[in-house]
């Protein structure tokens, strides 16, 4: 499967520092989750909570539009995080998407949901993948949009000091079907191979002329 990134900004939500994702949009109508039984009512309350969070994130978009004084306001993505320590969880946007998919499934009957559960049907992905946060010190260099190799800076200066750049990378697992071909493909008739694919994200880098700036670089994002 392929993970998508969306713009991310660091903002303050209700007086607390947090990471907001104004690019997030929901699909479908969460109000359709309401139903006659108690189980559905419980899911409706979860849907209302999720919808409220999304509305807050969308409201913040009006506050954090980039201005002339803040040229770097729109330079973050969900796969790049500036932090003083290693993030303990995957990017928030991915968690929100998984939760939204759960709510969408909640609109089906219990029987349909039971049969649609991948764990119950024995569903497996075509290619196995692993995801983890890596530092600029581990990446060292990357390729930008022009094809040039640039140095990925480990630390980013901020008003109160420095923060490290972390990248959430997804790549094909070295175990399982990575070398034997894609799962579910008939090897008698087809040749297949699981390959790690890359996408561009914005990061603070330095080119071979020692010029420092925000550039789009390639990182591993799916298998």
From Swiss-Prot:
Residues annotated as glycosylated: 107
Record carries keyword Signal: yes
Record's GO cellular component terms: axon; dendrite; extracellular space; synaptic vesicle
Keyword Secreted (UniProt): yes
GO molecular function, one term: nerve growth factor receptor binding
GO biological process, one term: cell surface receptor protein tyrosine kinase signaling pathway
Propeptide feature ranges: 6-114
Domain of life, source organism: Eukaryota
PANTHER family the UniProt entry points to: BRAIN-DERIVED NEUROTROPHIC FACTOR, NERVE GROWTH FACTOR NGF -RELATED
Function: Promotes the survival of neuronal populations that are all located either in the central nervous system or directly connected to it.
Family that this chain belongs to: Belongs to the NGF-beta family.
Protein name: Neurotrophic factor BDNF precursor form
Native source organism of the sequence: Chilabothrus striatus
Gene: BDNF
